[in-house]
Amino acid sequence: MHSSELMVTRIADRRWHALAGDRVVGCGEASPRPDGRLFLSIDSWHADAFDRLAAAMLADLPTPLYTVVDEVDHELTAHWRRAGLAIRRREWEYRVPTDPAITGLDSASPPGIEILNFGAAEAHSLCELDRTVRAEVEAAAGWQTMPAEVISPPIDPANYVVAAQAGRYAGLCRVTQPTRLPRIGLIAVRADAHRRGIARALLGRALGSLHRAGKAWASAEIDESNAAATALFEAIGAERSNSALELVWR
């Protein structure tokens, strides 16, 4: 197939097809994330079709534009780099043991802190805490450094272990199970409650609950620039299992 045979058509606001005659040989899509960023994806076995789709999407859409690739997929990374995108950040995926005998964590609470199990938090107060830590993260590193799944989740107390201090929620740990492997999506502590062992206690309670439920492992994604989270997870025996690259077109 020669590039001269290809035609790229925008079939919807955020969808494109690459056609060779009457055959669809590639598809492109732009998907908005909850933080407002637009992420691109292209599905094609043909390099020429990929290049033409990428060029059309980059020309049609407002910048900045983003995509995420598995770091071991060198061919896909090369396609996007050839289109002009640059690597913005790296995210590590960790395989996290849940057994307290391995992690060294227990379910004990720091002095003055109460840890509420999954489903025990009051929804309104949990939403208030979520808004507080969201604003604090945005003012510091920014939510663009966070995994996409944690940017704007629905608030379901069943997915949260929560720390309370003097009647006020101080920290949370969100765990979901999109597959058989539970995912630790977010650990966050209010800025005025840092350095009290709350994050470690939240993680200990969450992992202990998963272990008692028969889950030997969980997963977590951590931005490589997040030294505190990296240190916390590696100290309990978590191991890197994969990595993803986020690329950007400006």
Describe these PLM feature segments:
Residues 8-10, 113-128:
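A short beta-loop-alpha structural element at the N-terminal edge
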